[in-house]
Amino acid sequence: MTLTAVFAVAQGQPATTPQHPQSKLVPRKGSATPAQTTPVAATAGNGNEPDLAFGAFQRGRYITAFGLATQRALDRKDPKSMTLLGELYANGLGVPQDDKKAAEWYHLAAARGDPSAMFALAIFSLEGRAGPRDRQKSAQLMADAAKLGHPIAAYDLALLYIEGQLFPQDFSHAAELLRVAANAGNPQAQYALGTLYKEGRGVPKDLHEAVRLFSLAALADEADAQVEYAIALFNGAGVDRNQQLAVAYFRKAALSGNPIAQDRLATILANGFGVKANPVEAAKWRLISKAAGETDLPLDEFVSKLDPKSRAQAEDEARPWVDSIQRTLAANEHARGAAPAK
């Protein structure tokens, strides 16, 4: 589970030429279990001595890591070793999975100022592991970790300020937090901060800075940023116009499953914008984006006017994608139906 805060910036309907996609400030992708989101430093907390416990952890030697970290935590009161022990217990690596013991080690490390432990406890509190769910407590722990420079905590806390439920909505403070995470190389934060610059929310409107941030996130395979960067490249907005590179980024995002990119790529291929027109591939991507919920009447009309052979080929090429999308939608609907009432 991750934070569910989502800030949507309304955009226009898709047209026959690439437009701005629906922009979202979204949580990072994937689950946010502490093992995935809590970086544990590879050096000791009291010097530059290599951390053998963390080295063993990285190599998958979890029992060895547990023994070394335990010794270091007890002998040196090293907070990073305590956090590593929390990781091992939280995820059942080398020891039986035990949220209670994980939380105990995280608390000891957090009390000694380790931001990774603070963030891990924030996720525990958010998910109700080793205690009741408490978003307020989670937010406070994230704030504590963010103050110490934890990039993912800064990113998640920024989303809470954008959401405006636990805290008063504050785009300016959100931008400051996103900058911490973006400067640390977090692509979701780079994309989110770029969106704020593009919209002029919490920061002066600056398309060049927005595109710069989109480009950084796009290079790190953030699909939404790839779409934004591709649109900027295609239109020459905030960056030199380069339609061929734009098409490459649209295609990359489309292949990753982004329906906006799929729809824009279909438009480009249907009209031959910057590339040779390819009606069959255009129809394929339109069928895929339509299955994912994208509305585009001009493209639908384009597909309907294809000759039967070309349309059949497009349908055959799109079918694996469409089937996968439909299975995912059905599974999500089933999960919503099975969820207990709040």
Q: Would you name each region that the model predicts?
A:
Residues 8-83, 330, 342:
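N-terminal leader/linker segments that initiate helical-solenoid repeat arrays
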Residues 72, 109, 145, 181, ...:
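Alpha-helical solenoid scaffolds that mediate protein-protein interactions
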